[in-house]
Amino acid sequence: MEDFNFGRELRLLTPSHYSRIFNEPARAATPFFTLLAKPNDQDQPRLGLTVAKKRVKKACQRNRIKRLARECFRLNKHNIDNIDIVLMVKSGIDEQSNEELTKQLTKLWRKINERCKPGAPKPPPFKKRPNKSVKSNKQT
């Protein structure tokens, strides 16, 4: 019988766990989620969540999204290889229904799992966005 728990060993806990994934990750995205992932040396997948107050203003909505993501991961972890995943949310997610978010997450678990397999093409590096607060001194 499958083990459907979501214990401490299935979570990313320390800043070093997160920073390892941010260095050349495999990426997958939908309109409301971005997943970053890297293979790990554990015997199970692990999940880290980042739901920024800047993206989702109300605490009850941030908590709803985190509960939903943990539950969806817990039910799908047996289909995911040994990879570490960081889930980030985008603006506008708090207006979506639970069913829509679950559908997107289920699709993303499959997509990121394929992109982390050995032999999968490496993604291009992140492109740094220009800082919006710096004003251009360009003269016309």
Swiss-Prot record:
Recorded E.C. number(s)?
Answer: 3.1.26.5
- GO process terms (BP): tRNA 5'-leader removal
- What are the annotated disulfide bridges? none
Pfam families from the UniProt entry: Ribonuclease_P
InterPro entries cross-referenced by the UniProt entry: Ribosomal_Su5_D2-typ_SF, Ribsml_uS5_D2-typ_fold_subgr, RNase_P, RNase_P_CS
Q: What class of enzyme is it?
A: hydrolase
The GO molecular function terms of this record are: 3'-tRNA processing endoribonuclease activity; ribonuclease P activity; tRNA binding
Enumerate the UniProt keywords alphabetically.
Answer: Endonuclease, Hydrolase, Nuclease, RNA-binding, tRNA processing
What Gene Ontology terms describe where this protein resides (cellular component)?
Answer: ribonuclease P complex
Instruction: Provide the catalytic activity annotation.
Output: Endonucleolytic cleavage of RNA, removing 5'-extranucleotides from tRNA precursor
Give positions of region: Disordered: 115-140
- Binding partners and assembly: Consists of a catalytic RNA component (M1 or rnpB) and a protein subunit.
Q: HAMAP family recorded for this chain?
A: RNase_P
NCBIfam families noted in UniProt: rnpA
**Family, similarity comment:** Belongs to the RnpA family.
Quote the function comment for this protein.
RNaseP catalyzes the removal of the 5'-leader sequence from pre-tRNA to produce the mature 5'-terminus. It can also cleave other RNA substrates such as 4.5S RNA. The protein component plays an auxiliary but essential role in vivo by binding to the 5'-leader sequence and broadening the substrate specificity of the ribozyme.
Name of protein: Ribonuclease P protein component
Q: Which gene carries the instructions for this protein?
A: rnpA
